Amino acid sequence: SFPTRRSSDLSCKQLLMLSGIDKYYQFAKCLRDEDLRADRQPEFIQIDMEMSFVEEEDVLQVTEEMVRYAVQESLGKELGSFPRITFDEALRRYGSDKPDIRFGCELVDLTEEAEESGFNVINDADYTGAIVASEQLSRSAIDDYERVAKDVGANGLLYLQRGEDAVSGPLSKHVDTEPFIEALDLAEDETALIVAGRKRSAQEVLGHLRLKVRDDYDLTDSDNHAFVWVTDFPLFEWDEDDGWQPAHHIFTMPDEEHVDSFAESPGETLSQSYDLALNGVELGSGSIRVSDPDLQRSLLDFIGVGEEEAEEKFGFLLEAYNYGAPIHGGIALGLERICALLTGKNDIREVMAFPKNQRARNPMDGSPTEIDESVLDELGLEVRDGTS
């Protein structure tokens, strides 16, 4: 046999807190099977922190002071306190749990107007919302926005445009547009892009469209560093195949109201977790951890991890809990993401010495390379192609 990564490194940080080491801080090298986008690499560095005897407010304050100090020292900019919004508010206003708060173009909820419209495409939808572009978009531009909407899960895109004398767009042929115009506060020569569907997915589609409006019309300044805390994430998310699963990870502490009742109302249970975002990019994520063995076992059991499996995978941690665990929590921040955003770079590879390319290879030395057969023989390993 040979070792594999069975569980999160978070367990190791928790063990440090349980053993009496009340503060942990490390620039941790991470290897992860990431999809290779501009803000991701398979090898990266996290600023990793864990603290004992803390509440959520303590972690937020320590992290914020560190980031503000770093910005002051590196850029000479003095930042004020970071605003805080809840997960629900972030989706409701920005269509994202990592919102770019540098510009407006916030989502407008049109669900009530849609329900009263009599148009079955929208009046039966769980949610109908819109964003307003302060431009009279061309047909080809609207087609571009529709392609983006469909790429991220929408069935289609509706729109309304207000001209000098009339309101146009496919929706205008089926509904009384006046309630929509009033709710949108749609001015002359503006275009409203409208999405209907399941609430969260429709909000997230609008969030993507909002960022396209930002980029198309250059609504932001890269020198404006708008940090924001997002708090009160759901503890669980529903999965059609696996049922209720942790939205973050199963070691996250439920909110105080639902510590004893999360199984009865999982969809309403929030977590003591938090993310730090900058200009629409997630910089880091953290939480207050579970510190009670019975609660941890109950959470694992709720998501389908039985007692035997729990002991096999997490027995060392569950046993450590029994010796008395302090309340503890922490956060991990992506160092390269922070450096890229603070220096105005669009790709984290621009702030890395030896980044991987789009095929996850190091162009400098060609790694990773094929393993020499003699090395495999020495270790007693055999590599198969996955089809046998």
Language model regions located:
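Class II aminoacyl-tRNA synthetase catalytic cores and aaRS-like
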Residues: S1, R5-S388
